[in-house]
C-alpha cells in the first residue's frame, strides 16, 4: 500500500477514471489517496456535501484500502464506486452497510441539439430559445435561485452560498422571471461537475432544463475537458435529459459505517 500525493499519481493509478479524479479535486488541502495493487481510494472531504471515499479496483484490495482510509480519516467517509464493486466490498466487510444506488454520468463531448446542426461556437456563451438564452447569473440572483430550488428541487445538494458552489446559470422568461437553473459546483481541474438542476413546475416540458444543462456542461467541457454529474436512478426524466445531451451513465453505489 502506498499513499498518493499528487493528482498525476491519482490519474496514473486510476487510469484517469473520471469519478476518482473528480474526487481528488486537484489534491486540494484535506484530500488523501492511496493505491494497493490495482485498487485506488481517494478520501475527499465535503465533496458534493459528503465526505466521500471513492474507490476502484479488485474488491479484496479495495476492502484493505477502505479499512485503512477509514482508520486514517474517520467514520464519516462513505465508500463510493461502481455498484457491483461496492456490493462486493460490503459483502467482504461486515462492518459496512449499503447506503444506496445512484448514477454517475460523464462526457467529453455534447451531442448536437435536437433538430439543429452542431455549432462550433456553442461553448457556454448562450443557448437561445423562446424564453431567452441560458446565461450565467449575477451573484445578486442568489435569492431567486434559492427560491426556485426550494420549490422545484428541495433536495438539491448545490445551493447558493455553499463553499465551492462556484456559479449558477439560468433561463428567464420575457418578464425576467427565473424558470430554470443549474450550477458549476465542486468541479475538479479536469472534471467539471454539473449540479443544482431545477425547472419551475409551470415551465416544465419545454426543454428549459436541457437548455440550461447544455449551457453549463458546454462551459465545463471548455474549461475542464469533461463534465460529469450525479443523478438518482429513480429520476428517469433527468437521466433521459442527460443522455440526450451525450452523457454516458455509470451505475454506482455508496456504503458506510452504521450510525
What annotation goes with each model-predicted range?
Residues 227-231:
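Conserved hydrophobic beta-strand within the GNAT/NAT acetyltransferase core sheet
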Amino acid at each position: 500500500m502506498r499513499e498518493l500525493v499528487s493528482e498525476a499519481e491519482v490519474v496514473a493509478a486510476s487510469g484517469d477514471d473520471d469519478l476518482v479524479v473528480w474526487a481528488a479535486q486537484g489534491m486540494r488541502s484535506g484530500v488523501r489517496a492511496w493505491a494497493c495493487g490495482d485498487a485506488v481510494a481517494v478520501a475527499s472531504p465535503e465533496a458534493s456535501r459528503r465526505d466521500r471515499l471513492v474507490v476502484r479496483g479488485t474488491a479484496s484490495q479495495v476492502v484493505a484500502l477502505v479499512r485503512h482510509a477509514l482508520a486514517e480519516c474517520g467514520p464519516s467517509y462513505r465508500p463510493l464506486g461502481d455498484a457491483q464493486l461496492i456490493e462486493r466490498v460490503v459483502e467482504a466487510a461486515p462492518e459496512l452497510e449499503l447506503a444506496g444506488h445512484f448514477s454517475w454520468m460523464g462526457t467529453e463531448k455534447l451531442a448536437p441539439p435536437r433538430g439543429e446542426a452542431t455549432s462550433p461556437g456553442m461553448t457556454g456563451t448562450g443557448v437561445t430559445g423562446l424564453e431567452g438564452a441560458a446565461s450565467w447569473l449575477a451573484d445578486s440572483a442568489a435569492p431567486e435561485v434559492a427560491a426556485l430550488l426550494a420549490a422545484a428541487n428541495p433536495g438539491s445538494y448545490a445551493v447558493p452560498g455553499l463553499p465551492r458552489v462556484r456559479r449558477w446559470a439560468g433561463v428567464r422568461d420575457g418578464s425576467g422571471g427565473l424558470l430554470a437553473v443549474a450550477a458549476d459546483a465542486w468541479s475538479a481541474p479536469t472534471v467539471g461537475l454539473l449540479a443544482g438542476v431545477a425547472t419551475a413546475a409551470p415551465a416544465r416540458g419545454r426543454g428549459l432544463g436541457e437548455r440550461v444543462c447544455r449551457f453549463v456542461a458546454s462551459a465545463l467541457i471548455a474549461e475542464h475537458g469533461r463534465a460529469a454529474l450525479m443523478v438518482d436512478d429513480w429520476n428517469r426524466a433527468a437521466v433521459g435529459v442527460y443522455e440526450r445531451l451525450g452523457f454516458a451513465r455509470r451505475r454506482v453505489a455508496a456504503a458506510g459505517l452504521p450510525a
